[in-house]
Amino acid sequence: SINNKIKVPTKESIWTISGNNILSNNQPIILEWNNGEGVIFKRKIDLDDKYLFKISQRVENNTNQSIELYPYAQITRNKVPDDIQNFYISHEGFIGVFDEELKEDDYDDIKDKKIVREADEGWLGITDKFWVSAVVPTKGENFKSTFLYKDGFKANYILNNPTKINP
């Protein structure tokens, strides 16, 4: 049977470090959160020699029944930089590729209304003059993305179909 009343981590959850506690080039760290009911959530944080962070998530089901979870990710930017450039050669704001179509949305657009898109493949994020922060949904999994302003600028996605995790 499927248990849909599983406790999941929130922004208040306290994660613990498992194993190595120093993040360095090609030396990842693993954060864990145990829900106290037999399910352990893990986040592996990798840093490469070009300062690219890669965060992967995993769930261990130590219960006696299958569970279903809807994977999601979110990027939050608290405020727009004072020196935003908006040059035609460089986009600053929301960005994503949805089923091979590039979409760019300005901060002003998102402050006025949220933008929702669905796709089977792609990525989404927030970019600036010198950086990009992006999330990549599982390839081939239909997802809904939302760009919005609510207590900060947010780019997020959630898979439309749950992931089943067996014991």
Features from the language model and the residues they span:
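Soluble non-transmembrane domains of integral membrane proteins
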Residues: 1-167
